[in-house]
């Protein structure tokens, strides 16, 4: 059984706060993160993907904050 890598929760919280502060509607950004995490989880289940160590919600927060700070990611 492999151990999950340690995740810096303060880093995740900072990114979540960045998303919330950049959004005009706190509820809407929360729902968007939840929907992205839900899609990721479904995809992982369909592909029989082993959990990479990070919860889908945390991964969604990181992805969305990256898209916010690096808009060139979206264009690709």
UniProtKB/Swiss-Prot annotation:
It catalyses: RNA(n) + a ribonucleoside 5'-triphosphate = RNA(n+1) + diphosphate. In cyanobacteria the RNAP catalytic core is composed of 2 alpha, 1 beta, 1 beta', 1 gamma and 1 omega subunit. When a sigma factor is associated with the core the holoenzyme is formed, which can initiate transcription. This is DNA-directed RNA polymerase subunit omega. SUPFAM superfamilies: RPB6/omega subunit-like. Coiled coil: none annotated. Keywords: DNA-directed RNA polymerase, Nucleotidyltransferase, Transcription, Transferase. GO terms for molecular function: DNA binding; DNA-directed RNA polymerase activity. Promotes RNA polymerase assembly. Latches the N- and C-terminal regions of the beta' subunit thereby facilitating its interaction with the beta and alpha subunits. Signal peptide: none annotated. Belongs to the RNA polymerase subunit omega family. It comes from Acaryochloris marina (strain MBIC 11017). GO terms for biological process: DNA-templated transcription.
């Amino acid at each position: 059984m492999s151990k999950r890598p340690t995740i810096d929760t303060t880093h995740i919280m900072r990114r979540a706060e960045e998303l919330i502060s950049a959004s005009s509607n706190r509820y809407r950004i929360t729902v968007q993160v939840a929907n992205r995490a839900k899609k990721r989880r479904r995809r992982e289940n369909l592909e029989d993907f082993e959990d990479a160590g990070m919860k889908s919600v945390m991964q969604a927060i990181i992805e969305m904050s990256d898209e916010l700070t690096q808009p060139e990611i979206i264009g690709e």
